[in-house]
């Protein structure tokens, strides 16, 4: 029993610590990439090429004074960042990085992840209410409505994948896509693939769906009153969710750790590449897409975001799920 606890604790640390480092340097990559897209250099002063910038940013945040608004609900004000941070990292417990390399290989892994990603909204809403600020509350209300709207579309997209794969376990979904790139679901479930990733951008409150913290309207939304380490927790949760959406998109639609050269003449050449390398390469593509979209599109109005979710994404995914269910039931379609 003690050995199991120690092993589990070690595995958790092996996931959380590298993930926090990836989050830190993801912020650096974001500033660099968007800087180049805008014909700027980006951070280049702290360390060679600015590589130490994330470390000093973290030190700055964690050494700052924690200011609590006078009329805020002190206890909920402190709990809210933890409620946002914990689910964002707990969801990684069921993510398989390669065959057998997973903390908990659950049969209902996708359901667990959906629950964890939905639970993080409580931290945002509580932060907005407990801060006793109208701007924080407006941001929290927007976040609640936005997450509910796009969670439904994401849920339908996941249902389509589950029907096609015949499994709610993440490992089962990856194995169902083995056999080469033509077996990956981004081809047969292309509308669900597009909707899932765009809904993931909206769910993480990233541009162009960042009305939750629209600087020109409500200053900084739900974390306007947060400073220091409490603000850092929200920051870490947001970027961890971005990476989670990226890796889930890779797993559900791009075959996870499966090589794109399976069942081809190139399989013998690339057969030595570990599955985790393919998974991280695919994840990196979607992480870059988050940054590219932010640098390209202006912020949508709130009514446009709601219309996109309720009038386009939800009906589209619902209809496609029905089509997929009928095709699977009748034995028709590209599920080899």
Curated annotation (Swiss-Prot):
Q: What is its EC number?
A: 7.1.1.-
Indicate the principal place this protein occupies in or around the cell: membrane
Kindly give the Pfam families that the UniProt entry links to this protein.
Answer: NADHdh
Entry's Gene Ontology BP terms: aerobic respiration
User: What one GO molecular function would you report for this record?
Assistant: quinone binding
Alphabetized PROSITE patterns for the sequence: COMPLEX1_ND1_1, COMPLEX1_ND1_2
Q: Name one GO cellular component term.
A: plasma membrane
What is this protein called in UniProt? Answer: NADH-quinone oxidoreductase subunit H
């Amino acid at each position: 029993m003690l050995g199991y606890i120690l092993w589990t604790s070690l595995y958790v640390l092996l996931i959380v610590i590298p993930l926090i480092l990836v989050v830190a340097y993801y912020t650096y990559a974001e500033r660099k990439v968007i800087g180049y897209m805008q014909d700027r250099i980006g951070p280049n002063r702290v360390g060679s090429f600015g590589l130490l910038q994330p470390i000093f940013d973290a030190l700055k945040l964690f050494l700052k004074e924690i200011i609590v608004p006078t009329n805020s609900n002190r206890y909920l004000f402190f709990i809210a960042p933890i409620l946002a941070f914990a689910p964002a990292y707990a969801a990684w417990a069921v993510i398989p990085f390669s065959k057998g390399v997973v903390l908990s290989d659950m049969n209902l892994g996708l359901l667990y992840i959906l629950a964890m990603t939905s639970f993080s909204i409580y931290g945002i809403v509580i932060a907005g209410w407990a801060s006793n600020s109208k701007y924080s509350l407006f941001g929290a209300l927007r976040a609640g409505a936005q997450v509910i709207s796009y969670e439904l579309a994401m849920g339908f997209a996941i249902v389509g994948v589950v029907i096609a794969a015949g499994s709610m376990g993440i490992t089962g979904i990856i194995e169902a896509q083995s056999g080469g790139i033509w077996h990956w679901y981004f081809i047969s479930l292309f509308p669900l693939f597009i909707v899932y990733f765009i809904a993931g951008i909206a769910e993480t409150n990233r541009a162009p769906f960042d009305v939750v913290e629209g600087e020109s309207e409500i200053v900084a939304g739900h974390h306007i009153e947060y400073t220091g380490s409490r603000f850092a927790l929200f920051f870490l949760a947001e970027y961890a969710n971005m990476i989670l959406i990226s890796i889930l998109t890779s797993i559900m639609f791009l075959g996870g750790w499966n090589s794109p050269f399976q069942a081809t003449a190139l399989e013998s050449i690339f057969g030595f590449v570990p599955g985790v390398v393919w998974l991280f390469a695919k994840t990196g593509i979607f992480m870059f897409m988050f940054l590219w979209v932010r640098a390209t599109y202006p912020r949508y109005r709130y009514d446009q975001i709601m219309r996109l979710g309720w009038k386009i994404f939800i009906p589209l995914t619902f209809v496609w799920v029905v089509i997929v269910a009928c095709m699977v039931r009748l034995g028709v379609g590209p599920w080899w």
